[in-house]
Amino acid sequence: KSKIKKVTSIELDSLVGNSDHQGLAMKIDKPEIFDFENLKRSINNLGKIILILDHIQDPHNLGAIIRTGVFFGVKSFVIPKKRSASITSGAIKSSAGAIFHSNVYEVSNISNVLKLLKINNYWTLGTEIDGNDINSKKLDGFKNLNLAIILGSEQKGVSKLLKKKCDSSISIYGNKKIDSLNVSVATGIILSKFANP
């Protein structure tokens, strides 16, 4: 049974560390973050689709991607240890609890993850501005395969190194007035094409 304690709005701001709490806060255990060794041991239980987040910077985007992924049945997410958003209170809040239904693997080297996945029959798709249209029949063959989908950072996209390791590139084409979408929005559109929740 949880204990409920009433506090002033100033006390709540202080407890949470900001005023973005809608008048309510809950103390919870931080979700467990796994490493590359855990990923290797779990290789047969990662799921049909794994999302690899290539230096996503905004914790709120990270949380929103996890929320979207879990909605579409994704349970495994890979993030780099350095130069990337981590699992903060903001990321947890943005995930709307979805993070507690997922496994996040924090790794030193994404290339090593891709090598491991390739050996274990995963195909890699990387997001790009000028890749293959996700509605293209050319990509239909990927829909029944195990997939590692790489989502690039908000500013730089997928790194050149990781692009070279992809089996194919994928893009979402709009009306050209705007050249890209928020990464969490793009995640939802991509997963609606490739995931079977």
Predicted regions and their residues:
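Post-transcriptional modification and biogenesis factors for structured RNAs
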Residues: K1-P197
